[in-house]
Amino acid sequence: MEVEYGTLQDIGSWMELVRQVRWNFPGLETQAALEDHRRTVLRFMGEQRALCVKDGDKVIGVLLLSKKHNMICCLAVDPAHRRNGIASALLEKALLELDRSKNITVTTFRENDEKGVAPRGLYKRFGFTEGKLLVEFGYPVQEFVLRGKVQ
């Protein structure tokens, strides 16, 4: 499985995946929000901050990262391809792109939210620990933190 940078040629398939899983991402409920997200993905692609895994030409896993904020912004895998190591491969590549000497953050669902079981387990396996309780797009979430390594 190869993790690669998303390109303009991937945007259609990328957004198809986003539409398929948008119920898992607060803030993507409307067409306007999806269009705004598409613009964001294109910007991230142009800055090599958009990672993906493909099956042929079909995007089946995506990850957006912010080097400025040292964070994982979005991670999603096609439901038909879950439990095949795609999320782990994307996260491994992202951690190579981010500054490991500083804290790396990501927000995900809270502990008692059934949508949070898989992502929380993934982040914990990579060494992230539970952080602050937050609200994003009106939805309760929790920050996870991977502590920076002292050099």
Can you annotate each of these PLM segments?
Residues 88, 111-132:
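Conserved active-site alpha-helix within GNAT-family acetyltransferase domains
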Residues 98-112:
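Conserved GNAT acetyl-CoA-binding A-motif
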